[in-house]
Amino acid sequence: MESIDIIWHKKSTAFGPSFDIDLPTNIQALDDVIKRYNIDSCIHLAGSSSVGASNKNPALFYKNNVALTMALLDKLIANDVNTFVFSSTASVYADNDLNKCMETSSALPSNAYGSSKLAVESILKDYSKAYDINCVALRYFNVAGYDIEADPKNIRYKPNKLIDIIIDTAHRHATFKIFGNTYPTKDGTCVRDYVHVMDVAEANLKALNYCRENKGYQMFNIGSGIPTSNLEIINEVQRHLGKINTEIADARNELYYSLADITKAKEILDWTPAKSSIDKIVASAVKWYNMTHKKEIQ
């Protein structure tokens, strides 16, 4: 999070002005932007987010996710911005075996990424008590899919998430490695909870409205509540792109099961994921790939 993009939204337009401000060297520029556009709320989506990279370079993750978030919070508070929504992660949870993760489940991150996000959650809880700022942390599970109505020219495409990697592998007629197929899951492969990016966007708006009307701090799981295995993803991609070559590789030291209990978000935020079935997620990802690679949709 070396810089922050500020986008001002109005009902009469899709998006208003966009500003690129360097953090922390030019954080004073936030004062002018906040005052000029009378900003009273912030949805904070920036940060570093790779689990593997976080263990190799934890300093970067604590700087971007903790130190710079604190700098941003302090500036917002100084300018009387009293509503803050933070993108946290399911990586804050401990290994929960085959059980759903509830907000009350043990938080014991196994990587620096999760630890950095959990640290910010603690900060938000303390800040909401000490200062006039209401905070919500949204614990994202596996965000996937695309807004196929967006203009791909303005968005970078990098296949670094599982579904995108499988689609890219299929188009290249390469072989996809499945790391482990003897886990105690329905088909032996890792299971994750995939939630469509458009449902996540809706959750942020719901959280923002909640923040404006409720004092203090809250956290919510944002997932689909649907367990999907790696093999099921491969099968779904094959429905669009045909047979994918696979091979089984040794299991890696990773969490093999992650699933959200989203009861709290449903009841308190009145949020329900509408686009997060795996067929809709994969279909949007295939279409996005074809849009960005100038190929017809299969």
Question: Regions from the language model: what does each represent?
Answer:
Residues 62, 110-118, 152-164, 193-194, ...:
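Short-chain dehydrogenase/reductase
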Residues 27-64, 98:
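NAD(P)H-binding glycine-rich loop region in Rossmannoid oxidoreductase-like domains
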Residues 1-41, 158:
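N-terminal Rossmann/SDR dinucleotide-binding element
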Residues 48-52, 90-99, 107, 141-144, ...:
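Active-site segment of SDR-like NAD(P)-dependent oxidoreductases
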